[in-house]
């Protein structure tokens, strides 16, 4: 039986949930209906599920969600991952810190040439710094939980997050394009894709 580990982006990123339904909560219901029939198991770490509950009102479908999706965090203290991956991660963080410092220095020089610090300069600094430091990298405990659980279970990771997908690929975790999740689930449920209802515009996720 195939296993999938889910990130919140499956239910919060429009490029992904529109494949199930235009309305966010109905999209979750459609997902659960497919999950019930698919020859597969679905998992989500506890902190990630809590994050989803903070973003979506799960009161009416919480019991059904927890029936179809196993809520389970990785066994962090009994896992091993290749040491080279950690060295690569540390090197990438160091590179990003240097990049962030250069951006800060550049904006500091621009600010020094002005009599006062323009608000748009502060906004630009924040945006560029965030882009340099966070894009395409694991930047939260929840992200790490998703990747580690997929690694532990030898499961397929489903996420539109570039950083998670990039790290997962480094350590050999199976991936599925989140835009294709509905089609994959229909195949595992034995549905005829030719008779499936529309599943959203063909836009890239992430």
Swiss-Prot record:
It comes from the Bacteria. One of its GO terms (molecular function) is ribonuclease P activity. Residues 195-206 have a biased composition (Pro residues). Signal peptide: none annotated. It catalyses: Endonucleolytic cleavage of RNA, removing 5'-extranucleotides from tRNA precursor. One of its GO terms (biological process) is tRNA 5'-leader removal. Residues 187-206 are annotated as: Disordered. The keyword rRNA-binding does not apply. CDD domains: PIN_VapC-like. Keywords: Endonuclease, Hydrolase, Nuclease, tRNA processing. The keyword Cytoplasm does not apply. Disulfide bonds: none annotated. SUPFAM superfamilies: PIN domain-like. Its EC number is 3.1.26.5. HAMAP family: RNA_free_RNase_P. Belongs to the HARP family. RNA-free RNase P that catalyzes the removal of the 5'-leader sequence from pre-tRNA to produce the mature 5'-terminus. This is RNA-free ribonuclease P.
């Amino acid at each position: 039986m195939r296993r999938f580990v889910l990130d919140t982006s499956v239910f919060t990123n429009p490029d992904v949930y529109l494949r199930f339904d235009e309305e966010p909560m109905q999209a979750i219901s459609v997902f659960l209906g497919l999950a019930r029939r698919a020859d597969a198991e679905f998992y989500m770490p506890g902190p990630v599920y809590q994050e989803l509950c903070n973003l979506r009102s799960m009161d009416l479908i919480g019991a059904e969600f927890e029936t179809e999706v196993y809520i389970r965090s990785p066994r962090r203290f009994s896992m091993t991952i290749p040491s080279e991956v950690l060295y690569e991660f540390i090197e990438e963080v160091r590179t990003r810190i240097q990049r962030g410092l250069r951006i800060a220095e550049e904006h500091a020089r621009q600010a020094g040439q002005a009599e006062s610090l323009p608000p748009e300069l502060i906004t630009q600094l924040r945006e560029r710094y965030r882009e340099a430091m966070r894009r395409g990298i694991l930047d939260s405990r929840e992200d790490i939980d998703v990747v580690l659980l997929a690694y532990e279970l030898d499961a397929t990771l489903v996420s539109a997050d570039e950083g998670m997908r990039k790290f997962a690929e480094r350590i050999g975790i199976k991936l599925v394009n989140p835009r294709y999740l509905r089609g994959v689930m229909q195949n595992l449920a034995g549905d005829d894709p030719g008779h499936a209802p529309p599943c959203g515009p063909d836009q890239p996720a992430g």
